[in-house]
Amino acid sequence: METDGGGWTVFQRRQDGKVDFYRGWEDYVNGFGHFNTEFWLGNDKLYKLTSRGQYELRVNLEDFNGDKAYAKYSNFYIGDKSTNYKLTVNGYSGTAGDSLKRHNDHAFTTKDKDNDTHSSVNCAKNYKGAWWYYTCHASNLNGLCLCLKLLNKTKNKCNVCCFKQYRYFARPYAFNFKRSKLWVFKPAECPQGHQM
């Protein structure tokens, strides 16, 4: 596990597209990637971590212009394997908008294990990444990031690696991201004045 002082644990990082996030169930259960570059910690580890008391979540985002935003949630928990790692998240604050609200109380879906509530498609297959989908998403930070060159010709492809509530400057790609980092911490363990 990667920690950053006083109880912070990073469980997802994307920054350069060198690690493939379009993977199956077992990879997401066990984790993959490299802690010093891009990785997913693993749903089993995330469940074990968040089951030890109240945890908060912070989502750090950076778009293709270098603009940054964050979302913070005062309550974050992942269920165990029997719940398909169901997400519990609430208590939003921040600058990125609440793009996880609609994902609350939904199970984790991968390309080979369809747990979303969409009746006709597997959202993970459709959007090329595993996530806590409903029908299908308001955020998808494990999706295929295709917006590096701002694909103006294929708008729909720019709707994959995203946090949809983050809109500003009326740009069509304002909610698509080059970098993301998901952190959890136990409030009692976070030192006063700790900055991320």
Regions found by a protein language model. Give the residues of each.
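Mature extracellular or lumenal effector domains of secreted proteins
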Residues: M1-M196
